[in-house]
From Swiss-Prot:
Native organism: Acinetobacter baumannii (strain SDF)
Gene (UniProt): dapD
Protein's name according to its UniProt entry: 2,3,4,5-tetrahydropyridine-2,6-dicarboxylate N-succinyltransferase
GO cellular component: cytoplasm
Chief place where the protein resides: cytoplasm
Subcellular location: Cytoplasm
Length: 273
């Protein structure tokens, strides 16, 4: 792996000196190997090691290099035609491949090649971008989008219209991460590398970026870029120091309890093989 990452890192630094037409075969092969690893889940842009999230920046660079090395080409889907650099993940898949993967894909859901969906993932009509990792038992509900290189944990529910931010444009240092057993309410947006820690529940219409104040009403503490584990978060406002106006904030109203779990529990019937 160190050799592969070294080739990618050096190619990224030197990318102004070659084009898709004259790219050295070693670089093209390394980029393809990295994208294939992201696609089958053996590689991921970020992973939790000893309780801390570690970002493998070289894989993000491999994704960016893949756009440089691949030309746009027509992509067919029944009567629809597209023109893009990245193939769709499930193009040409057989019934046996779908059964082996254990993924349910509801039309017209789209996942790009280079994204990974683990067993018992359900993709309602939604979009999963390149580099994203969606772990076991998660549902990506209708019109939800999982951005480039985003990391979605096990048994997560991304409700209708949810947006999970990517890293490619605008260029972000770290991917957005939703940890295991989280519930993200309809039309909420989690972006800019924010981490929603395990077991948290985000209400409808909550918008969280790196500059969003995340206020814990029980302790008075303000967090940035991280929702603490087991939090229940709703949209709200905090007053200015002079009391003349208020600005948007995400408010931690309580910790997840049995009542919250009952309202946000996952339906195993929807994930049965």
């Amino acid at each position: 792996m160190s050799q592969l990452s070294t080739i990618i890192e050096q190619a990224f630094e030197d990318c102004a000196n070659f084009t898709a037409a004259d790219c050295p075969s070693e670089i093209r092969q390394a980029v393809e190997e990295a994208i294939a690893g992201l696609d089958n889940g053996t590689l991921r842009v970020a992973e939790k090691i000893n309780g801390e999230w570690v970002v493998h920046q070289w894989l993000k660079k491999a994704v960016l290099l893949s756009f440089k090395l691949n030309d746009n080409k027509p992509i067919e889907s029944c009567d629809l035609r597209f023109y893009d650099k990245v193939e769709t993940k499930f193009s040409g898949w057989t019934e046996e491949q779908f059964k082996a993967a254990g993924v349910r894909v509801v039309p017209p859901a789209v996942a790009r090649r280079g994204s990974f969906q683990a067993k018992n993932v359900v993709l309602m009509p939604s979009y999963v971008n390149i580099g994203a990792y969606v772990d076991e038992g998660t549902m990506v509900d209708t019109w939800a989008t999982v951005g480039s290189c985003a990391q979605i944990g096990k048994n997560v529910h991304l409700s209708g219209g949810v947006g999970i931010g990517g890293v490619l444009e605008p260029l972000q240092a770290n991917p957005t991460i939703i940890e295991d057993n989280c519930f993200i309410g309809a039309r909420s947006e989690i972006v800019e590398g924010v981490i929603v820690e395990e077991g948290s529940v985000i209400s409808m219409g909550v918008y969280i970026g790196q500059s969003t104040r995340i206020y814990d009403r029980e302790t008075g503490e303000i967090h940035y870029g991280r929702v603490p584990a087991g939090s229940v978060v709703v949209p709200g406002n905090l007053p200015s120091a002079d009391g003349k106006y208020s600005l948007y904030a995400a408010i931690i109203v309580k910790k997840v309890d049995a009542q919250t779990r009952a309202k946000t529990s996952l339906n195993d019937l929807l994930r049965a093989d």
